[in-house]
Amino acid sequence: MVGVGGERRSGMKGHLLSTEDLSRDDALLVLDTAERMARVAEASVRKLPTLRGRTVVNLFFEDSTRTRTSFEVAAKRLSADVINFSARGSSVSKGESLKDTAQTLEAMGADAVVCRHSASGAPHRLATWVRGSVVNAGDGTHEHPTQALLDAFTMRQRLGRVDGLAVTIVGDVLHSRVARSNVWLLATLGASVTVVAPPTLLPIGVSSWPVEVSYDLDAVLPKTDVVMMLRVQRERMSAAFFPTEREYSRRYGLDVDRAATLPEHALVMHPGPMVRGMEIASRVADSDRSTVVEQVANGVSVRMAVLYLLLGGSGEVS
């Protein structure tokens, strides 16, 4: 990872593929840089010349609106040239392999490739085939590191710290790359994490994660500083993981009554997209506790920071 002053740092090593690779110093550098980037959004001219002449390719093999748009806005605010590459209707849909696509990107001279793929590990393979930096924008059920970074950034903005916070992640942990990235990053930053889910929606290896496991949401909420609700990812399911949606919502949904048991300062987070009425009630999602809209805005600042640090952006960010 390239620091603000150009010094080489450990952790990302030219790429951002997993939060598990980040040291505490790496993570704090991204969050601190994102704070400076956030001030750019408040300026009269919301643009920096730091990546002028650089090319960032958004390579998305899965449909995405918010993440792709967020990376596009981030790169453009740093004055980079942006190429959006969608697998649908492209050579990929005609049978081109990921390696063939990588060779095409290499020929284009891409300085950074932001990759989302349905296969876990695809960005890691891509990073071995291209000379530019690779940013994992979500790979299968594996990781989504910039989402975890923006979540931590949001916690720090609202609560002043991440170290020492009690964070509860609720829902479809089994299929959630967001949960995995958050678990590793939050542990690195000193938070304590509890995951709450039906046994069928917990991964087999969860016992090796730095988390507590609970099946009782009501018992955990009163001791929680941040509760992060996850969507049930039916598109990744080939069988029934719980009896009915109504039963799931009754046991693991955050309704108004449950939210009232949270400490007064506690936050409600959701990486989106939300299924209102299932994992979260509309009144809770739209309440003052909710950071859903802030998370979207903060995503641009965090992704600006990641691109700036990976590509060794020129000039100071005040």
Swiss-Prot record:
GO terms for molecular function: amino acid binding; aspartate carbamoyltransferase activity. Pathway: Pyrimidine metabolism; UMP biosynthesis via de novo pathway; (S)-dihydroorotate from bicarbonate: step 2/3. L-aspartate binds at K94, R177, R231. It catalyses: carbamoyl phosphate + L-aspartate = N-carbamoyl-L-aspartate + phosphate + H(+). PROSITE patterns: CARBAMOYLTRANSFERASE. One of its GO terms (cellular component) is cytosol. Carbamoyl phosphate binds at R66, T67, R116, H144, Q147, G272, P273. Pfam families: OTCace (PF00185), OTCace_N (PF02729). Keywords: Pyrimidine biosynthesis, Transferase. The keyword Ion transport does not apply. InterPro entries: Asp/Orn_carbamoyltranf_P-bd, Asp/Orn_carbamoylTrfase, Asp/Orn_carbamoylTrfase_sf, Asp_carbamoyltransf, Asp_carbamoyltransf_Asp/Orn-bd. It is an enzyme of class 2 (transferase). Heterododecamer (2C3:3R2) of six catalytic PyrB chains organized as two trimers (C3), and six regulatory PyrI chains organized as three dimers (R2). Catalyzes the condensation of carbamoyl phosphate and aspartate to form carbamoyl aspartate and inorganic phosphate, the committed step in the de novo pyrimidine nucleotide biosynthesis pathway. PANTHER family: ASPARTATE CARBAMOYLTRANSFERASE, ORNITHINE CARBAMOYLTRANSFERASE, MITOCHONDRIAL. Belongs to the aspartate/ornithine carbamoyltransferase superfamily. ATCase family. This is Aspartate carbamoyltransferase catalytic subunit. It comes from Frankia alni (strain DSM 45986 / CECT 9034 / ACN14a). The gene is pyrB.
